UniProtKB/Swiss-Prot annotation:
Family of this protein: Belongs to the plant dehydrin family.
Molecular function terms from GO: metal ion binding
Pfam families reported in the protein's UniProt record: Dehydrin
GO cellular component: cytosol
Function: LEA protein are late embryogenesis abundant in higher plant seed embryos. There are two subsets of LEA proteins (5a, and 5b), the first ones are expressed when the cotyledon weight reach 80 mg and the second set are expressed above 100 mg. The function of those proteins is not known.
Low complexity: compositionally biased ranges: 60-86, 139-159
Keywords associated with the record: Repeat
PANTHER family noted in UniProt: DEHYDRIN LEA-RELATED, DEHYDRIN XERO 2-RELATED
This protein's name: Late embryogenesis abundant protein
C-alpha cells in the first residue's frame, strides 16, 4: 500500500469513490508502492528545461512575470508543471518513468507544413494493410500500352460470371495470413 502522509504526519489511506481501499497498480496490474508527503503548500523548484524557475500559479514572487511557468502538486507529492511553451513536464516520479518515443503504429503523421497531425483510424488501417509503407514511400506505378489494341468477346461460362464489388471485410480478410481465395 502507499505510505502517504499529510503535512501533520497523519497517514493518508487511498480509497475509491465509495470508501473502499484501493491497491495502486501499473498498466500491467503489478502492485506499486509510493511513499511521500502530500502537501497543499506551494512548492518552488528549479526547471529542468532551462534556467527558468517555476512557481505556483497563485502568487509569483515580485519581479517575475506571471507567464514564466506554473506548478501544481498532486497527492503523491509528484509535481507537474507547464512552461510557457505549452509542454508539460512531470517531476520526481515522472523523471524516473520515461516513455519511449517510438511506437509500432504511429498515431500521427506529417501534415506537409513541417508539423504533425493526428491520423484517422482509416489512415491507420490503410497503413497496416498497405504492407506497412507510408504513402510517401510507396513507389508510383504507371501502365503504358503500345501498339494496336484488339477487343475480344467471349461466350460461355466466363461471360456469365460478373464481379461483385468487394466489401471492406473481404479486403481485410484477403490481407490476413493463411487466407486462401475460395471463390466459386
Amino acid at each position: 500500500m502507499a505510505d502517504l502522509k499529510d503535512e501533520r504526519g497523519n497517514p493518508i489511506h487511498l480509497t475509491d469513490a465509495y470508501g473502499n481501499p484501493v491497491q495502486l497498480s501499473d498498466e500491467f496490474g503489478n502492485p506499486m508502492h509510493i511513499t511521500g508527503v502530500a502537501s497543499s503548500a506551494p512548492q518552488y523548484k528549479d526547471s529542468v528545461t532551462g534556467n527558468i524557475a517555476e512557481y505556483p500559479t497563485e502568487a509569483p514572487p515580485a519581479g517575475v512575470a506571471a507567464g514564466t511557468g506554473a506548478a501544481a502538486t498532486t497527492a503523491a507529492g509528484v509535481t507537474t508543471s507547464e512552461t510557457t511553451t505549452g509542454q508539460e513536464h512531470h517531476g520526481s516520479l515522472g523523471e524516473h518513468l520515461r516513455r519511449s518515443g517510438s511506437s509500432s503504429s504511429s498515431s500521427s503523421e506529417d501534415d506537409g507544413q513541417g508539423g504533425r497531425r493526428k491520423k484517422s483510424i482509416k489512415d491507420k488501417i490503410k497503413d497496416k494493410l498497405g504492407g506497412g509503407k507510408h504513402k510517401d514511400e510507396q513507389t508510383p506505378t504507371t501502365a503504358t500500352t503500345t501498339g494496336p489494341t484488339t477487343t475480344t468477346t467471349t461466350t460461355g461460362a466466363a461471360a456469365d460470371q460478373h464481379h461483385e464489388k468487394k466489401g471492406i471485410l473481404e479486403k481485410i480478410k484477403e490481407k490476413l495470413p493463411g487466407h486462401h481465395n475460395h471463390h466459386p
